[in-house]
């Protein structure tokens, strides 16, 4: 299949592009930033005309201080890009079979167990951002099938969130728990994320919202201690929330308040996680060059 992808050069996009190309035999068509500038709508329409699937991963990094300017960038890089994809799809005569649009578990309330059937959403900027992002994606025209994926923290030692956590651990041999440590830490291994995306492409009956998180729910402390053990940390320290609030301001809530999320619909659909637990995640800490299973 021809698969158009925003965010193809990002951490998730690179892994997913390689997986879908090498394991699925698909052709990836990157949709770069230039294609979403004003006056480029014709080129976007022309590109989507030849695509079977669209995967929308676009979005500026969330894990930095949320200044008014960065909040606007977070909004524009997600909602504005999604809006222009939908506008282009409405102009395409032969619609793609599937659109997969990313979101995040930040949609849900903090500290309350949630799944795709949960009716309430969280409070604050992150939940509002996810809500607006998904609302725009839901304007996807028929007959294109729409899947919305709410990502947890995506993990692999070669990049992303884990690389940021490993950098100070390797330098100091101290595993730092983000206080209080009891907050949920919803996570998914990059290999399972890639397999889940292929699962959506292959199973045409699947549509709607899916949580992309591992079935094992852990706290921030449990995860950090397991990581410290795997990477031979000398000790584990709890860093007070106030430190992160000073560093990140409002964005500290991304680290200090977590969502307890279950992948209920994915499990109901028959998806089997290759990395369902943190014990499995840290079994082989040297998988910098990932071996992605075919199924």
Residue ranges of model-derived segments:
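N-terminal Rossmann NAD(P)H-binding glycine-rich loop of SDR-like oxidoreductase domains
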Residues: 4-19
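NAD(P)H-binding glycine-rich loop region in Rossmannoid oxidoreductase-like domains
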Residues: 35-84
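Catalytic helix-loop patch of NAD(P)-dependent Rossmann-fold dehydrogenases
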Residues: 76, 111-148
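Conserved Rossmann-fold NAD(P)-dependent oxidoreductase catalytic core, especially the SDR/UDP-sugar
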Residues: 83-124
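NAD(P)-dependent short-chain dehydrogenase/reductase
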Residues: 124, 131, 141, 145-148, ...
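Alpha-helical substrate-binding/gating segment
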Residues: 166-175, 183-217
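Conserved small/polar residues in nucleotide/adenosyl-binding loops
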Residues: 288-294
């Amino acid at each position: 299949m021809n698969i158009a992808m925003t965010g193809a050069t990002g951490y998730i996009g690179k892994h997913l592009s390689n997986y879908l190309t090498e394991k699925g035999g698909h052709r990836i068509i990157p949709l770069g930033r230039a294609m979403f500038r004003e006056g480029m709508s014709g080129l976007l329409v022309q590109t989507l005309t030849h695509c079977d699937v669209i995967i929308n991963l676009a979005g500026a990094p969330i894990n930095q201080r949320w200044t008014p300017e960065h909040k606007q960038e977070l909004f524009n890089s997600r909602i504005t890009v999604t809006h222009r994809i939908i506008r282009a799809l409405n102009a395409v005569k032969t619609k793609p079979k599937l659109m997969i649009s990313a979101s995040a578990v930040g949609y849900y309330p903090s500290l309350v167990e949630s799944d795709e059937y949960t009716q309430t959403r969280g409070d604050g900027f992150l939940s509002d951002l996810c809500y607006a992002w998904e609302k725009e994606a839901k304007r996807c025209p028929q007959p294109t099938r729409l899947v919305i994926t709410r990502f947890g923290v995506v993990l692999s030692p070669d990049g992303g969130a884990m690389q940021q956590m490993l950098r100070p651990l390797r330098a100091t041999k101290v595993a730092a728990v983000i206080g209080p440590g009891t907050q949920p830490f919803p996570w998914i291994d990059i290999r399972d994320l890639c397999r889940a995306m292929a699962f959506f492409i292959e199973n045409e009956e699947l549509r709607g919202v899916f949580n992309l998180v591992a079935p094992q729910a852990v706290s921030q402390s449990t995860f950090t201690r397991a990581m410290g053990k795997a990477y031979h940390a000398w000790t584990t320290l709890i860093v007070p929330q106030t430190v992160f609030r000073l560093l990140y301001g409002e964005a500290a809530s991304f680290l200090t308040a977590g969502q307890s999320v279950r992948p209920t619909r994915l499990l109901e659909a028959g998806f089997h996680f290759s990395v369902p637990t943190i014990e499995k995640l840290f079994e082989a800490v040297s998988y910098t060059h990932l071996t992605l299973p075919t199924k």
